[in-house]
C-alpha cells in the first residue's frame, strides 16, 4: 500500500491517533513511523506498509555496468565529455556493421515469416544448423530438441537459475559477470558460493578451492564457468576444462558454461568448446550473437543442452526451463532466421578475424601501458574484449582524490564518494569526474578485489592509447594524493 501521508490537525488527541495506528495493526497493516509524525504542531500519519515485505532478497542489488551510466550522464549534463569504457557494446563504440550483413537482415525482413511467432524452442532450421555445427566437431552429440532460444542470454540466465530449487546452489567464479551473480542470489536469497580467479596467477581459477567447496557443501548442484571469462579476459586451457568436468562427474553436479566469447580468442591462446570435453556429464552451454556478430540489440541467445537423456533429475530441470519458456510463447524470430545466413556467408570468417586482430592490438597496448603502473596487478587479456586491473589494497584509502577543475563536477563527485562506498568505486568516480573516462569498479563483479574493468572496443587506436595512458597517470596521481 502506498503511504497515506494524511495530515491530522492538532485538534486530534494523541491518544486517538495512537488508537488509529493500533486499528491499522489489528487489520494486518504495518505502520512505519515517519520522522515527521509530530512537526510544527501537526501530526502526520506517516507511512502505512503492505501486510509484509513483498520484495525478494536481493532487491537492493545493483547492476553497476549500467548504474555507472546514470552517474556519467549526470556529469555530461555538467559539461563532462565522457569516454564510455564501461559496457561491452561494439556497435556503441563505433563498430561498423558490414553491408553484406545488413543486406541479409534486410532480405529477411521482406519475408513474412520474420513477422510470425517462432516455435517455442526456436526456429527449426536454425536449431538444425547449430546441431550440425556441434555434432561435426565429434564431441557430445545433440538433436534440435536440445536447443532452446531466448531473448538474449540475460533471459536464458534468469530462466536457468530461477528453475533451480531455492536450497540448491550453483558455485560461481569470483569475480563473476554480474548477471550470473544476480540470478544466483535472487533464486536462493543468500550470498553465493564462489571459487577464486587468481590475479597473481594470470586469473587462473583455483580448482583446488573449487573441489574443496563442492565436496564440503552438499547444497552445491552446479558449477558456472565463463569461457573466455568476463570480466577478466582469461581463456581456459583444455586441461582446466577437463579438470572441471571431472569435478562435476565425481560429485554428481551439472555444468553451466557461458560461452558467449568462445570464438573470440587471440594472442595465441587456445581453448575448446564444452561439447568437446563434457563426456556424459549433464551440462548447459550458453551462446549468443550479441558480441560475435555483433548484434547486441537483437537480444538473441540460446542454450545447448548436453546429456539430459542420461540423468532424470537434470531432465526434469530442463523441462522446467522449457515450460517457463512456453509461457512467453517464443523468442524473437528475425535474429534466429539471420544466424545460419550470416555465419555461412563467405565474408563472415574474415570479418571476425579482422575484429580479433583489433582486440589483440588493443589488449597489448593496454597491457604494456598498465603493467608497469605501481600498485596495479595487470594480466594481458587473451579473450573477449575486456581488460581488468586490480589495485594492491594496501595502497587504497578514503582520503585519496583526483583534482577536478569544475566546481559543480567536483561537488557532485565529492557527494558521491562521501557515502561510504567501496574504495575502487571511489577511484572510478574521481576518474570519471576528472578525465571523463568511464570504467566499472571491479567490486561490482562481486569480489573483494579492488580494481576496475575497461573495454577493448575503441576503434581509434590513438584515442585508445590516450585513454589507457590517462588511466595509468590517474592511478599514480590518485595513489600519491594522500601521501
Regions found by a protein language model. Name each.
Residues 31, 35-49:
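Short, Lys/Arg-enriched N-terminal segments with co-localized hydrophobic residues
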Residues 42-47, 132, 136, 140-141, ...:
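PLP-dependent enzyme catalytic core of the Aspartate aminotransferase-like
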Residues 49-152, 159, 206-209, 342-345, ...:
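N-terminal small-domain helix-loop-helix segment of the aminotransferase-like
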Residues 103, 276-360, 364-373, 377, ...:
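Conserved core segment of the aminotransferase class I/II
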Residues 113-247, 256, 262-277, 284, ...:
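Conserved core of the PLP fold type I
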Residues 336, 356-367, 377-394, 401-415, ...:
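Conserved glycine-rich beta-strand-loop-beta hairpin in the small C-terminal domain of fold type I
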Amino acid at each position: 500500500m502506498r503511504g497515506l501521508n494524511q495530515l491530522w490537525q492538532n485538534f486530534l488527541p494523541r491518544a486517538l491517533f495512537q488508537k488509529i495506528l493500533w486499528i491499522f495493526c489489528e487489520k494486518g497493516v504495518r505502520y512505519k513511523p515517519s520522522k515527521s509524525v509530530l512537526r510544527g504542531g501537526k501530526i502526520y500519519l506517516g507511512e502505512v506498509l503492505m501486510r509484509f515485505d513483498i520484495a525478494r532478497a536481493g532487491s537492493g542489488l545493483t547492476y553497476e555496468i549500467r548504474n555507472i551510466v546514470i552517474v556519467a550522464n549526470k556529469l555530461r549534463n555538467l559539461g563532462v565529455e565522457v569516454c564510455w569504457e564501461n559496457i561491452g557494446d561494439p556497435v556503441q563504440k563505433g563498430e561498423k556493421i558490414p553491408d553484406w550483413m545488413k543486406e541479409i537482415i534486410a532480405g529477411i525482413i521482406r519475408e513474412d515469416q520474420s513477422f510470425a511467432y517462432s516455435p517455442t524452442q526456436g526456429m527449426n532450421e536454425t536449431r538444425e544448423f547449430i546441431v550440425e555445427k556441434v555434432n561435426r566437431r565429434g564431441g557430445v552429440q545433440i538433436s534440435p530438441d536440445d536447443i532452446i532460444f531466448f531473448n538474449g542470454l540475460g533471459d536464458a540466465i534468469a530462466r536457468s537459475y530461477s528453475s533451480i530449487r531455492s536450497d540448491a546452489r550453483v558455485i560461481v567464479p569470483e569475480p563473476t559477470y554480474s548477471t550470473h551473480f544476480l540470478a544466483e542470489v535472487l533464486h536462493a536469497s543468500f550470498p553465493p558460493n564462489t571459487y577464486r580467479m587468481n590475479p597473481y596467477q594470470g586469473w587462473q581459477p583455483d580448482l583446488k578451492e573449487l573441489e574443496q567447496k563442492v565436496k564440503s557443501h552438499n547444497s552445491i548442484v552446479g558449477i558456472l564457468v565463463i569461457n573466455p571469462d568476463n570480466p577478466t579476459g582469461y581463456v581456459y586451457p583444455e586441461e582446466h576444462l577437463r579438470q572441471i568436468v571431472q569435478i562435476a562427474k565425481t560429485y554428481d553436479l551439472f555444468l553451466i558454461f557461458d560461452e558467449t566469447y568462445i570464438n573470440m580468442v587471440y594472442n595465441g591462446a587456445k581453448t575448446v568448446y564444452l561439447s568437446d570435453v563434457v563426456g556424459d556429464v549433464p551440462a548447459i552451454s550458453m551462446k549468443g550473437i550479441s558480441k560475435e556478430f555483433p548484434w547486441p540489440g537483437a537480444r538473441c541467445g540460446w542454450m545447448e543442452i548436453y546429456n539430459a537423456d542420461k540423468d532424470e533429475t537434470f531432465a526434469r530441470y530442463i523441462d522446467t526451463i522449457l515450460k517457463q519458456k512456453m509461457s512467453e510463447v517464443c523468442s524473437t524470430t528475425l535474429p534466429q532466421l539471420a544466424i545460419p545466413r550470416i555465419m555461412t556467408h563467405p565474408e563472415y570468417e574474415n570479418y571476425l578475424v579482422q575484429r580479433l586482430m583489433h582486440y589483440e592490438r588493443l589488449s597489448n597496448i593496454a597491457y604494456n601501458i598498465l603493467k608497469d603502473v605501481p600498485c596495479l596487478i595487470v594480466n594481458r587479456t587473451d579473450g573477449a574484449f575486456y581488460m581488468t586491473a586490480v589495485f594492491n589494497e594496501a595502497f587504497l584509502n578514503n582520503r585519496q582524490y583526483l583534482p577536478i577543475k569544475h566546481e559543480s563536477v567536483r561537488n557532485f563527485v565529492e557527494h558521491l564518494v562521501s557515502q561510504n562506498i567501496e574504495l575502487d568505486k571511489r577511484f572510478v568516480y574521481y576518474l570519471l569526474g576528472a578525465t571523463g573516462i568511464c570504467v566499472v569498479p571491479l567490486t561490482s563483479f562481486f569480489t573483494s578485489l579492488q580494481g576496475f574493468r575497461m573495454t577493448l572496443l575503441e576503434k581509434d587506436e590513438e584515442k585508445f592509447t590516450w585513454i589507457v595512458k590517462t588511466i595509468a597517470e590517474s592511478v599514480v596521481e590518485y595513489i600519491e594524493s594522500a601521501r
